[in-house]
Amino acid sequence: PTWTYTHNGFYWAGAYVNSDFVLVTTDDGAEGYVTGRGSILSLNPKTGKLIDSLQATNVGDLRSSVCYDEETEAYYFTSKGGDLYQVKVNADGTFTKGSLRRLHLDNGADSASAPPMSTSTPVIANGRAYIGVSGTSQFTAYSGHNITVVDLSTFSIAYSVPTMGYPQTSGLLTTAYEDQDGYAYVYFFDNYTPGKLRVLRDKPGMT
């Protein structure tokens, strides 16, 4: 490899890359997901040198990839502690001071020991973020698993749709039909046997 960088572990975490910086999230370095805090790192894409880092403001490994939304000019990722994060980055790859925001997700139980964890990279379109969220028991049917829709203009949950299993991966979104009916369609799979393919039809303003 051209370079390597080690920090607490990178489990499932994919990177956002452009010519100026690489953004990647990390595990928290602690056992489980209710004690330590993961970080988001900004690295030089050519040398691997650390440009900047931010620690999450709540517990949990950070195991999603990082995505960028042009409309809000911000980057998004999720945590196993049950949060959606938003952060902004300067042109030099440093994080914009004071820009880190956190929205706690919901699985129907306000429990620190069974948080609404997410490893789902947010899929974003039209000011909406779509996220797969775990229930209180990862492999128990209908234990609070859901697809959560977040209104980014208010940085709040618009609504959620219950699922049989945990939608553990990212959704696949198409805007191909917006000119016809005004809706985006988002496809998610339950991580459950037998698996289910779910299609969510959504547009701004829906709750």
Language-model region placement:
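Extracytoplasmic/lumenal domain signature
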Residues: 1-207
